[in-house]
Amino acid sequence: MNYRIEISLLPDPNQMLMYTGFRNRITAAALFSTILFVFLFQGSAMGAGQEKKRATATRTSGQVNIDGRLEEPSWQEAVPATDFVIYNPHNGIPSSYRTEVRILYDDDALYIGAIMFDSKPDSIYTELGQRDEGDINADHFWVEISPFNDGLNGEVFKVSASNVQIDNKMTTSESWERHDTWDAVWDSRTTVNDNGWVAELKIPYSALRFPRSATQLWGINFWREVRRIRETSSWNFVTKEFGSSIAHLGELTGMRDVKPPLRLSLVPYVSGYLEHVTDEPGVGTSYNGGLDLKVGLTESFTLDATLIPDFGQVQSDDQVLNLSPYEVKYNEKRPFFMEGTELFNKGDIFYSRRIGGTPHLVRAVYDMTGENEVVTRNPSEVSLLNATKISGRTSGGLGIGIFNAVTNSTWAEVENTVTGEKRRIMTEPLTNYNMLVLDQTLKNDSYVSVMNTSVIRAGEDSEDFYTANVSAFEALVKTSDRLWSASAGGALSQKYYTSAPTALGHFMTFNAGKTGGKFRTDYNFMLMSDTYDPNDMGYLRRNNEISHSVDFGYNTYEPFGNIMSTRTSVDISYDQLYMPRAFTSASIELDGMLILMNYWSFSLNLGFTPWGEDDYFEPRTRDMSMYYHRPPAFEARLRGDTDKSKRLYLEFNGEYMKAWSDYGQHGYSWSLQPEFKASRRFSFDYEIAVEKMFNDIGFVEADPVEGITFGKRNVTTVTNTLSGAFIFSSDSYLTLRGRHYWSKADYDGSYYTLQADGSLSDRTSDVDNSDVNSNFLNIDMVYTWRFAPGSELSLVWKNSIWSEGDVIIRSGLDNFADLLSMPQTNSISLKILYYLDYQNFRKVFRSK
């Protein structure tokens, strides 16, 4: 029905004949979707009869020492969970190695004791690594826990044989992807003995959220990885054919009269910085202090707040030269905005880098100066005053998330060079960011969610400073066997101005198909209006789009010959511009991947756009009145990697592109990344990535007297990245990362004027030099010492150099020498944070 509504809203009735074909396609798509829904909810009984195992927790009244030995009598009284089943490589057969897991509990914590039997204990891998580094060369044991047993949300506590801790959140919506930015405070110890190795875990109830009930019934599963033979097994069987691991949890029984504790913790910090810029005198100093607060409002809901935060030690961004019409999206690296944000990722309308990001008018300031005025100060970042999160889930499965943050007003300073008069220009007002999420779990790992974001800027509204709001929903429904699913979503964006009409935009999406089993297929529909804009608090690369796609895939999960598993798929898509309604592209993509029994993997992707693409975004016109017709093109991508458990690991990527046009557009890219484990303490990896585009056609800023200008250029990008880590212990490590990015766009002097039919004609007037030679060099060296649970000392050295000019430097050595002659920023910082937990204080006072 939504499809017909969109058709009826076409702005020009005279164009209806033009859209008849499109309308028929929409009707056919709706019919196809209806038929698919019939099959979807009839379902199949395959895989639905999997019986859950049950493990029993035993209450202990004695003290449990976390030493990795399991010598307390209580451990012998607990009933072991055994009979693990292989996940990789032979899914579904008994594990080659015996494993026993016992569970104890008391009023404060859950205790897990696991014995991993191994006839070759001297061959157990024990590489050291940083906390949350889950892919180190070591044997692993982990437990997945879902206190609400909803099949949708849970926590993972993982430990290596070398006692490196990894913890993360897991959800069914991300399949096997997990949020490894979550850091809980828990304890573990491991030992290696003549029979194998032992892991002992203590998980305080303060690290979990669970319902207030006399009898607890939790979802649980245990996993083991034997690294040297790459065998992974689980206690409760997990099939590869559908769903994520959280959909295959067993059950934990026996826990009675356990009360959710008062969860209250403080993490105060102090930090200091020394900074020097080579072409400026003196050394700058600064000192900061603040705290993070965590409060359990109820047994299921937690408030997280950060007051006067300091994110100066986060890893430097991988900056790039951007020749496209789209904004570059950088990953979030600030801990507060990465931890406990699973609910806020719903609907894809929250991009936390907007908070404390670049001021709206940071570039416009230079156009706001008067005669004889120069900009003397123009901050590139907005100051964050505070941020708060409230999140949790009720016993009925309703998840609630509330986020709020306040950023300070930001001012640029301008000075008159003749009179000396100074004035300030506001580049960003005091701003409040808010998000509300409601997420209801349903049967069969299904859910429905509604979300809302709002950005309220203080002061007088204008074209730049306005109030923005986005309301959205999404829903996922699965059949009882989890083989078929359907999802739908939509959003409405609103911008409120004082002196202009409210700007409204909308977005909708629909997907249905067979998403489990060996053969898979689905249909996707997406519609985004030309006015849909969630970017005040979210990130959207581009709007104004309608897309249809159908995907067919076939996967194998059982080994045959030397092949462990395969994945193949065909994707056919058809895309249009929403306004004005017009064809943009059609493509077909073939994808194949295989994993060998020696854990080498290879993938091949082939893409075709047989009719080319009408690109309405490259001309940079707001009204989409012009487009550039990109010629038919072909792309081939190849990837391969070796067994990561070996001392030397290699990853290779290669790509070739060719367009059929008079300009001879073609290009290639490749990357090679060797990783070497010199010892169980020291490892390093190096990556070189090269991309070359020949006779590339792109937009050029020039005098618009002849119209929109395009130019022909060769674009070369070379990126070198070196990373290394020396691990003193599981709580102390030194890391180093250096990255040099060099990109140059070399125009050959051929410039063109864009025509109304998307073609190009030779430009007759001159164009200024458009060449670009851009460099970014960043070095981050970090020493981390986790001196107590949840407490940390970090010492960081950063070096950054940037250069950009219109002179192309041909030689790599000459380019690097020129870069080193530019001003460098060096900083050294020390930060200490200390974890204070109410439960620990309560135990101390209770013992007295």
Q: Where do the PLM segments sit?
A:
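Sec-dependent signal peptide cleavage junction
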Residues: S44-A55, N840-K848
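Exposed, low-structure sequence patches enriched in small/polar residues
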Residues: S383-L385, S391, T467-A468, D481-K848
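Outer-membrane beta-barrel transmembrane domain signature of Gram-negative proteins
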Residues: F237-K259, T410-D481, K514, S601-R647, ...
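Extended, well-ordered alpha-helical scaffold/bundle regions in very large, multi-domain proteins
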Residues: T302, I308, S316-D317, N331-K333, ...
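Bacterial N-terminal signal peptides
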Residues: A29-Q42
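Alpha-helix capping and helix-loop boundary segments enriched in small/acidic/polar residues
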Residues: D279-P281, D292, S324, N378, ...
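Structural preference for beta-rich elements and adjacent junctions enriched in aromatics
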Residues: G47-T441, V450, M822
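Bacterial N-terminal signal peptides that target proteins for export
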Residues: Y3-F32
